[in-house]
């Protein structure tokens, strides 16, 4: 699922990508992958790294792109003794765009629709 957010008076969802906006991608499918790599020219290696469930927090660069990988909490419904686990989220930036990619559906980015 792909969402385009533009900063006006808070984050406003747009129907299509605009320069200087934020593209939030959750559980990317083939269309999302193609959009990111072909339309936005995001390095494919960045998306592969984010897909690795064991990926550790770090930064990397390729060309004018910066990748920051963080780990965010997700509810663990399979083990009640360990209520939360963490999964990687990638924040990919260049001079015109911010892209966040997470291969898991989490609530961590769902608060972006709030007005600041």
Where are each of the predicted segments found?
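Conserved small/polar residues in nucleotide/adenosyl-binding loops
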Residues: 112-116
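Divalent-cation
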Residues: 1-110
């Amino acid at each position: 699922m792909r969402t385009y957010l533009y900063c006006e008076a808070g984050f406003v969802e747009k129907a299509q990508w605009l320069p200087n906006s934020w593209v939030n991608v959750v559980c990317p499918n083939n269309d999302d992958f193609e959009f990111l790599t072909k339309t936005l020219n995001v390095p494919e290696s960045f998306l592969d790294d984010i897909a690795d469930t064991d990926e550790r927090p770090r930064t990397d660069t390729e060309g004018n792109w910066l990748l920051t990988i963080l780990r965010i909490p997700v509810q663990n419904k399979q083990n009640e003794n360990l209520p939360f686990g963490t999964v990687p989220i990638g924040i990919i930036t260049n001079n015109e765009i911010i892209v966040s990619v997470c291969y898991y559906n989490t609530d961590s980015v769902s608060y972006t629709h709030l007005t600041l």
